[in-house]
């Protein structure tokens, strides 16, 4: 029971603080007061350039004026290279910049959150939680005296369109004063607000966070992994410009991310409180001090349990891991010399530990894939479920199956002490390798290994009576389980059910560390454990599947798009390959074929379902030739592209020619884009093009005609009757995980 209790305590304490009500003191953050802003902010989606976003901008400016906070709207035309190919994202952005001058004002602390949302949801958490927290923090700051340094509250536009608002703020005169940035995001609707990324002097920032935040939660593993996930936030822009910063987000409730369920009702009060608490306390502390150093020794940091944050210099990580490996090797050698270990038994134990962990990962992945395919849960692009707990419990139970079967197989081949060393040796080697490659993640292996090493030592010192052995094994396992659960739970939340095999592979290795305690508890009944774990896993997975069906309060996503190809005089209904059900069938038929549609969806690198559709009389972009000049072999085309009302994105695809200059509006494309475009062509996505038309200038060398394919993308599906609309149990697929509820019209012109 103590071991189960340790897991329960770790899970129960991994939560945000209690939300404060309206009666909280005026100088502190109150989630109840912040929530009042969400009721009007997250009424409906507010994608970049939309009428709803314009309304929100006006309301924000009105609130800031009522608080007597100096604010302005920064309007800037922004072009940003996406990735390394010739793809450019562009928009005219409207950032809201609120500036609180400091008493000295030698530098500025920047607090940022984006006030736009995805088209597929009202964005209460992403990123209404940041906007509401910023407004409540501003109110609290105005109750006290001015701070020492300037504070800039930046409400960015067009974050969901590709961080364009943050890129635009780099053009603002105030940006030169910014030395510190705090950015607030959400990848779910609940859970603690975690520090998941830093830029600049990491060690100095972690120490400030540890000293200042009332409930500091986060870990350096996230900071090591995040840069490789291909995800970016506004802090990415500021960090690349040399600004020191901290990035915060809550990540539980992933299934709501970028969907209609990212609503005020789903947003947890505790998450909002934690967000705002971090924002207000860190802003006060950082704006009261001096500028951060340019460099600072890195630190490893993590929460062993709850909001207890431990940090230490990163330089300690490798010596600690090497020391633990040496201790384990010495223990192994000592056991062999004393006759307690046999080389063959040890080799089998190591092989069993590694193969058991791999088998557990494969079993869990297969079980989830079968469950997804059988229930239709593969429709959730986030790789999760509305009720993940039964699935998480079922998959965790399955981890015990290969673990128990291997112990049953090794009953007459491998001794318990050999199993113990067979688990700790590969863990110790992994600890050293991980520390070399990824020092911020070293705590994940080092500290559990230290606790695991103490168990056999305590056994040899504690006597051999059954009650003493049980006490030592149980008490040794409690801190190990506390630490591991506190570490693996946020990792599993970040990865989702689709990648549960990764986190549960580690869980299987942890079972190996706990072998002495588990062997004492099981007393050789490993067959019973395997059968019981299989049954428990099946029951939980089945119960989760039965309860997972679409309902009005838990809708499932189904994608649908309409593509009109004017060149080929054809039209298609398009949908994700995992789309199924009666609603989609009325457009796609019962068994639609699948293929790639790069002309319509160039960002997708997969097949989509399709079915022929009627050619609708929809307006498309119109390109007017303003000027066409030639000097030698260089041709300069000046164009004006008019897009129909309701166009969310105007896309240009230029062929692979030797472009010397491409100018969108008044802004030239970077040379890197032109260089890439000479081989691959150039793609420009301009969000919310101006109503008066978008100027486009092309300077190209050579005689070949410029065949430009233009596309208009609107955020709707044309001519749906009331009976054809989605039922309440369905919703649009999440933005950013493919496509949904868009109309694409393409045409090619020879210029």
Where do the language-model regions lie?
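C-terminal domain-closing interface element
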Residues: 177-195, 317-340
């Amino acid at each position: 029971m103590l071991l189960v209790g340790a897991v329960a305590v770790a899970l129960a304490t991994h939560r945000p603080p209690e939300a404060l009500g309206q009666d909280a003191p005026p100088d502190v953050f109150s989630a109840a007061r912040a929530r009042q802003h969400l009721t009007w902010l997250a009424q409906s989606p507010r994608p970049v350039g939309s009428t709803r976003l314009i309304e929100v901008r006006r309301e924000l400016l009105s609130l800031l004026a009522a608080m007597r906070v100096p604010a302005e709207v920064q309007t800037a035309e922004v072009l940003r290279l996406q990735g390394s190919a010739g793809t450019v994202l562009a928009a005219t952005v409207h950032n809201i910049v609120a500036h609180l001058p400091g008493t000295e004002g030698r530098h500025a602390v920047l607090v940022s959150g984006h006030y736009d949302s995805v088209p597929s949801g009202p964005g209460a958490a992403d990123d209404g939680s940041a906007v509401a927290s910023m407004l409540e923090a501003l109110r609290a700051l105005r109750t006290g005296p001015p701070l020492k340094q300037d504070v800039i509250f930046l409400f960015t536009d067009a974050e969901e369109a590709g961080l364009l608002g943050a890129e635009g703020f780099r053009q603002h005169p105030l940006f030169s004063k910014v030395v510190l940035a705090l950015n607030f995001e959400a990848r779910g609707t609940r859970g603690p607000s975690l520090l998941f990324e830093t830029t600049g002097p990491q060690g100095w920032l972690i120490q400030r966070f540890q000293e200042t935040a009332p409930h500091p939660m986060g870990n350096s593993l996230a900071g090591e992994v995040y840069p490789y996930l291909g995800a970016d936030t506004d802090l990415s822009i500021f960090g690349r410009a040399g600004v020191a910063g901290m990035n915060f987000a809550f990540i539980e409730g992933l299934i709501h991310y970028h969907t209609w369920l990212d609503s005020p009702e789903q947003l947890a009060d505790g998450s909002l409180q934690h967000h705002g608490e971090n924002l207000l306390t860190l802003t006060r502390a950082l704006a009261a001090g001096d500028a951060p150093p340019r460099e600072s020794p890195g630190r490893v940091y993590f929460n062993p349990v709850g909001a207890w944050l431990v940090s230490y210099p990163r330089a300690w990580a490798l010596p600690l891991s090497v020391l633990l490996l040496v201790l384990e090797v010495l223990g192994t050698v000592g056991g062999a010399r004393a006759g307690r270990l046999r080389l063959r038994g040890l080799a089998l134990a190591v092989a069993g530990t590694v193969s058991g962990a791999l088998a557990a990962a494969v079993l869990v992945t297969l079980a989830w894939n079968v469950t997804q395919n059988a229930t239709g849960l593969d429709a959730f692009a986030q790789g999760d479920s509305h009720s993940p707990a039964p699935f998480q419990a079922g998959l965790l139970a399955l981890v015990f199956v290969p673990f128990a079967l291997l112990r049953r197989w090794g009953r007459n081949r491998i001794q318990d002490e050999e199993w113990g060393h067979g688990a700790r040796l590969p863990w110790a080697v992994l600890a050293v390798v991980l520390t070399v490659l990824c020092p911020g993640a070293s705590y994940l292996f080092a500290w559990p290994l230290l606790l695991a090493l103490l168990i056999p030592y305590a056994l040899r010192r504690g006597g051999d009576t059954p009650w003493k052995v049980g006490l030592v094994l149980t008490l040794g396992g409690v801190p190990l389980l506390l630490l591991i659960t506190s570490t693996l739970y946020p990792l599993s939340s970040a990865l989702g059910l689709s990648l549960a095999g990764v986190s549960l592979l580690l869980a299987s290795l942890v079972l190996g560390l706990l072998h002495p305690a588990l062997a004492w508890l099981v007393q050789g009944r490993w067959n019973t454990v395997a059968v019981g774990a299989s049954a428990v896993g099946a029951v939980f997975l089945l119960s989760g599947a039965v309860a997972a069906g679409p309902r009005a309060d838990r809708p499932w996503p189904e994608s649908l798009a309409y593509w009109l190809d004017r060149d080929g005089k054809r039209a298609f209904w398009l949908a994700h390959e995992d789309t199924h059900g009666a609603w989609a069938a009325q457009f796609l038929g019962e068994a639609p074929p699948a293929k790639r549609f790069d002309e319509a969806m160039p960002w997708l690198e997969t097949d989509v379902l399709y079915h022929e559709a009627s050619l609708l009389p929809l307006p498309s972009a119109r390109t007017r030739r303003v000027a066409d000049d030639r000097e030698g072999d260089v041709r300069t085309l000046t164009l004006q592209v008019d897009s129909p009302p309701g166009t969310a994105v105007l896309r240009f695809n230029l062929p692979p020619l030797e472009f010397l200059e491409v100018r969108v509006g008044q802004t030239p494309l970077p040379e890197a884009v032109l260089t890439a475009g000479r081989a691959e062509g150039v793609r420009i996505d301009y969000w919310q093009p101006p109503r008066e038309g978008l100027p486009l200038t092309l300077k190209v060398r050579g005689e070949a005609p410029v065949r430009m394919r233009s596309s208009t993308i609107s955020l709707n599906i044309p001519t749906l009757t009331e009976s054809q609309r989605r039922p309440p149990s369905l919703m649009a697929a999440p933005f950013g995980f493919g496509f949904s509820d868009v109309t694409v019209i393409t045409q090619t012109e020879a210029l």
